Amino acid sequence: MGLSFSMGLLHVLGAIAGVVSHQCYFRRGEHHLYPFTYVRWYAFIITSTTVVVSFVGGVSLYDSAKATGGWTVTYFVGLYISLLLYRVHFHPLHGFPGPYGARISGLWFSMGLRDRPAFQKLQELHNQYGPIVRVGPSELSIVYPEAVGIIYGHQSRCSKSTFYDNGHPMGSLHSYRHRADHDQRRRTWSTGFGDRALRGYETRVREYRQKLFTRLNDAVGLTVNISDWFNFYSYDVMGDLAFGRSFNMLDTHSNHWAIQVLLDGIVLYKYYVPSWILRCFVTLPSLSKNWHRFVEFTTQKLVHRMNDKVEIPDICASLLAPLNGRSPTTDELNLLMGDSMLVVTAGSDTTATALTSVVYELARHPEEVDVLRAELLAIDADANGEYLHDQISKLPHLNGFINETLRLHPPVPSIIPRKTPADGIHVNGKHIPGGMTVFCPQWVIGRSEAAFMAPLSFNPERWYKYPDLIKDRSAYAPFLTGPYSCIGKPLALMNIRTTMARLIATFDIRFPSGEDGTRLMENAEDHFSMGIERMPVVLTKRR
């Protein structure tokens, strides 16, 4: 009876320990960076307890393991009962609407993305539950137009969420979570995106755009997957601007192996799994093998670039300038690698998606092509059909067309997570508690009647001729807004404008028979940035 009583007490104490560990530790602060540390600690505690109980109690290791195992089970039962009760009934977000499963686990949202992209899922949830939806235990999706400025704007008190720690310890401008660190690094980047630097990039980019149009001219009259060519083009451009050397994808008509490794690796991001799960993939060698291959490749390219002298500065020149010719420290090298990878990934995928979306809308609206061509008549192109960016950057309909395309097809369509300050924030009169993850999905807001009149209609003139069609301009943020906005926006817009102008001047664009592109656009990948794998069109010489 004494042994039975002791075992029962041990199980009770185990359950109590589970509750206490949740209430006093796991529900407070952040614990995502080193998930396997907890596994190792639990394994150590269980093993050492088994040995100690066997030695002190004079029982066999088998009996000791049974007793310790029982205690371990009751510990986790106590921990998860405490966690479930807290998330369902006592969590600060318990009063916000949303699916019941989202209260319990962040994996509920991830499971819902098996057959649809995140931006589609969020649209469905907001249609069902309203402007604020609880999509995870501590996560809210918010589509009130005013929320964009409150969460992302210059006066926002929100910070970056745990999502940005996925590449730790490698850092980058994108991953800095603390405002002071980010602002300091952004000043280094900013020299690479001034007017003088952009004029230099324009010269470098033309070489690759000429290759792109040579390939497109070869495909006149045929069905071509324009998405592939824009991806080849964008990665070649950003490889040149990041490392001084392109990936030669326009020449080989295929993905460079390192880019294919990168694209294969970002598939996991489309499920928006909790940060601790992503950290498992990053920190476990067997799961992160391809990631480390890409990092090693990036390191080699960066070292070559550091030893090169370039006549026309690239983005990397600005990042290397603070070194003044000396070798970087380990921390500086990690930062340079992260920033170089950021140039390639953030500048390529998003620009290719934007250009593909532009072609989609050009094919859907041939009447807009006539307006755009009329606008370009006053501008002289060179012998290759190239327009100087300075001459077209202020064209109202061209810019309106791009704005309208990015409103309906934002390259980063759904989740850009932020963490609310300790005292919380207020959105539309509702208090959102501190320490919560919040985001404003641009794909949903861009189609919201609260932000735009006739939101599903494609009307470039709303941006310069009919301002009443825009109810809240601050809600439009395809490049984000505020201190963490996309620093590469000037380069992206220069590339989009000049490529689009040459497309309009050179080709007529239509969909192949039986295709209108809608299904392909609405079922695009959403892995933080949007990925449009297929967009078949037929290009013919301008009539």
Swiss-Prot record:
Q: How does it sit in the membrane?
A: Multi-pass membrane protein
Write down the EC number.
1.-.-.-
GO molecular function (one): oxidoreductase activity, acting on paired donors, with incorporation or reduction of molecular oxygen
State the practical use: Notoamides have been shown to exhibit antitumoral activities. Notoamides A-C show moderate cytotoxicity against HeLa and L1210 cells with IC(50) values in the range of 22-52 mg/ml, but the IC(50) value of notoamide D is greater than 100 mg/ml. Moreover, notoamide C induces G2/M-cell cycle arrest at a concentration of 6.3 mg/ml.
Instruction: Write down what this protein is called.
Output: Cytochrome P450 monooxygenase notG
Q: Name one GO biological process term.
A: alkaloid metabolic process
Query: Which lineage?
Result: Eukaryota, Fungi, Dikarya, Ascomycota, Pezizomycotina
User: Encoded by which gene?
Assistant: notG
What the entry lists under InterPro entries is as follows: Cyt_P450, Cyt_P450_E_grp-I, Cyt_P450_sf, Cytochrome_P450_monoxygenase
Subcellular location as annotated: Membrane
Leader peptide range in chain numbering: 1-21
- Per the UniProt entry, the glycosylated residues are 225, 403
State the similarity comment: Belongs to the cytochrome P450 family.
Pfam families for this protein: p450 (PF00067)
Write down any Gene Ontology CC term. Answer: membrane
The transmembrane segments are: 41-61, 65-85
Pathway involvement of the protein, from the record = Alkaloid biosynthesis
| Keywords (A to Z) from UniProt | Alkaloid metabolism, Glycoprotein, Heme, Iron, Membrane, Metal-binding, Monooxygenase, Oxidoreductase, Signal, Transmembrane, Transmembrane helix
Q: What does this protein do?
A: Cytochrome P450 monooxygenase; part of the gene cluster that mediates the biosynthesis of notoamide, a fungal indole alkaloid that belongs to a family of natural products containing a characteristic bicyclo[2.2.2]diazaoctane core. The first step of notoamide biosynthesis involves coupling of L-proline and L-tryptophan by the bimodular NRPS notE, to produce cyclo-L-tryptophan-L-proline called brevianamide F.
Q: Which cofactor does it need?
A: heme
What are the binding positions for heme in this chain?
Answer: 486
Could you confirm whether the keyword Oxidoreductase appears in this record?
Answer: yes
What EC class does the entry list?
oxidoreductase
Q: Does the keyword Magnesium apply?
A: no
